């Protein structure tokens, strides 16, 4: 038996060697063909280059050909000889992602399985139920956080706090938000069975929900702040954003708007063409808005307004912050460069790069950084230089160059858009952050209180005027205390760090009584802290309750009355002389 086994082994090895030789031969043949193809490509690319640059270009193209050939040969060997069978999509996908990660954060690869993700990003559309979900620690499951108005989740009767028990019979206990979200999404028109547990009810609820095309609202709210000042909240630039803004501007003007507050805070950008179309409403036809400059000639473009505007003289204030980026920076930066509006708030993010979506073989896609953009003054506001190999360099203030607006005001490139009027937002205490942010409060005290409140109050006052009463807040406060709500107090953390340093430097023993006294003073007194921060906690609690009755639009409308930056913008728009002086040369605040 042993001899037969050895003979069988030899036979199998001979077959394996022949297969391996055949694979190596095929690999060698493929590599030779690839090499010839790459050399031809390199030659063609060189021929298209001016003579004085041909030597450098030829060397570059040859190096590209060599590296591609090396990569192809390397993976062929891995596939042929590695001890375990490789998943080509995963292994090569990781290689691609590592390569792109060394460039900039915006150049990304999307395999066929992730093409829907790119489409959602570009259009703001996806197939689903239209609801924000959050993970509930106490239930160890995801819950409905915020159903969007008039979308499947809301029309099916889902409410804030509903626990997602199962989807099409699959148990969702312990599953995180990405997993549950992926199962809630799907092709529009498809249906699924959802089982939920509603707080306060013992019996589970089952419902059949049909997915629809969900368009996340790029303009969740607009309205009149005063008799003459309009307000528009624009949260992203996706397909149709300009159409929404146009409708809002026209409607607000019909209702008496004489000046506008355009809120671009936390707007991460999106479509450049949508930004140009929005600016077209406020500047004359034929105005140059933005130029893009890249490596290829076709990346060099100039975008001008092509339609008649709605209003070129109405005062406009653009509210911005550190999360205002890309297309929203083109919008506020152009308003600043053309002295068409005042920019208020804090410095913007500083993204002056343009991405182009490209199709790849086998239904894969990529989003590729192809150009820098330059707003009307000629400046690029990119704040970070990506130097390859994952290295970043923030543009130093000393290297930022001066440019001039239409009226001669000095503005700078690099580092984002500096506001004409700097207004810091109200600071957010840690206790409020922990109470309101999903995933930080293990007691879920705010969500549970809101769900209970809504179950006991069929209706509330209009969104703009509703406010939690003192009695309601006292009930919330007692619930937080009874439920054992805790949060990370920065003062305690800093004191612990200080004690460590004092021990290391040998001062702790001498100051021990003082340290212990300070520790005692800083111990949690939750009741006192909830009283001290009552006003701002009430604001967040009120907003959460309002969203259950009037959805996202109502929550925004309610919050505006407490917004320090909005108040300052209204004050400015009520003062025409100050507004005009800011847009005069060298007049900034």
Would you name each region that the model predicts?
Residues 1-8, 15-61:
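Bacterial Sec-dependent N-terminal signal peptides
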Residues 37, 52-67, 71-88, 111, ...:
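Cleft-lining beta-strand/loop regions that shape enzyme active-site pockets
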Residues 73-81, 85, 89, 94, ...:
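Structured segments of extracytoplasmic/periplasmic soluble domains
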Residues 79-143, 191-211, 216-221, 560-570, ...:
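Extended, small/polar residue-biased N-terminal targeting/export presequences
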Residues 129, 308, 369:
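A structural signal for short loop-to-beta-strand junctions that line the ligand-binding cleft
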Residues 327, 339, 350-406, 416:
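Polar, glycine-rich mid-to-C-terminal structural blocks
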Residues 380-589:
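Conserved functional hotspot residues or short segments at active or partner-binding sites
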């Amino acid at each position: 038996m042993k001899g037969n086994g050895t003979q069988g082994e030899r036979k199998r090895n001979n077959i394996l060697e022949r297969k391996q030789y055949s694979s190596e031969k095929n690999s060698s043949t493929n590599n030779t063909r690839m090499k010839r193809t790459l050399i031809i490509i390199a030659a063609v690319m060189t021929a298209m280059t001016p003579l004085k640059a041909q030597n450098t270009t030829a060397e570059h193209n040859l190096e590209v050909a060599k590296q591609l050939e090396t990569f192809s040969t390397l993976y062929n060997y891995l596939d042929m000889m590695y001890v375990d069978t490789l998943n080509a999509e995963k292994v090569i996908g990781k290689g691609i992602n590592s390569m792109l990660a060394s460039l900039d954060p915006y150049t990304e690869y999307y395999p066929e399985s992730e093409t829907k993700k790119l489409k959602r990003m570009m259009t703001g559309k996806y197939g689903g139920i239209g609801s924000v979900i959050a993970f509930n620690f106490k239930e160890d499951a995801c819950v409905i956080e915020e159903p969007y108005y008039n979308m499947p989740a809301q029309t099916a009767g889902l409410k804030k706090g509903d626990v997602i028990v199962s989807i099409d019979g699959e148990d969702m206990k312990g599953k995180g938000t990405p997993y549950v979200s992926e199962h809630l999404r799907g092709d529009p028109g498809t249906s699924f069975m959802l089982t939920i547990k509603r707080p306060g009810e013992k019996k589970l609820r089952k419902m059949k929900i049909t997915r629809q095309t969900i368009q996340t609202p790029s303009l969740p709210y607009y309205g009149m702040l005063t008799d003459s000042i309009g307000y528009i909240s624009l949260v992203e630039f996706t397909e149709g954003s300009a159409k929404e803004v146009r409708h809002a501007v026209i409607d607000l003007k019909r209702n008496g708007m004489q000046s506008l507050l355009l809120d671009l805070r936390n707007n991460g950008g999106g479509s450049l063409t949508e930004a140009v179309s929005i600016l077209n409403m406020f500047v004359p036809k034929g105005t140059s808005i933005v130029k893009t400059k890249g490596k290829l000639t076709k990346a060099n473009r100039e975008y001008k307004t092509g339609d008649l505007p709605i209003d070129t003289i109405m005062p406009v204030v653009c509210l911005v912050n550190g999360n205002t980026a890309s297309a929203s920076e083109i919008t506020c930066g152009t308003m600043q460069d053309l002295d068409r509006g005042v920019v208020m708030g804090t410095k913007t993010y500083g993204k002056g790069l343009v991405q182009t979506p490209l199709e790849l073989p086998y239904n894969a896609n990529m989003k590729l950084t192809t150009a820098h953009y330059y707003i009307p003054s000629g400046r690029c506001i990119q704040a970070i230089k990506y130097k390859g190999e994952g290295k970043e360099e923030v543009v130093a203030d000393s290297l930022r160059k001066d440019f001039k607006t239409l009226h001669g005001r000095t503005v700078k490139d690099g580092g984002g858009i500096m506001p004409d009027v700097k207004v810091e937002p109200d600071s957010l205490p840690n206790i409020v952050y922990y109470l309101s942010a999903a995933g930080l409060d293990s007691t879920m005290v705010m969500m549970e209180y809101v769900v209970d409140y809504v179950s006991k109050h069929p209706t509330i006052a209009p969104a703009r005027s509703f406010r939690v009463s003192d009695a309601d807040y006292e009930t919330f406060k007692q619930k937080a205390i009874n439920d054992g709500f805790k949060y990370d107090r920065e003062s305690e953390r800093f004191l612990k760090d200080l004690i460590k340093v004092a021990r290391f430097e040998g001062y702790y023993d001498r100051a021990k009584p003082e340290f212990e006294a300070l520790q005692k003073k800083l111990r949690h007194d939750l009741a006192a802290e909830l009283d001290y921060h009552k006003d701002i906690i009430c604001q967040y609690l009120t907003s959460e309750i309002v969203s259950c009755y009037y959805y996202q639009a109502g929550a925004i409308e309610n919050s505006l009355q407490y917004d320090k930056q909005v108040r300052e913008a209204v004050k400015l728009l009520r003062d025409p002389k100050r507004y005009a002086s800011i847009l005069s040369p060298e007049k900034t605040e």
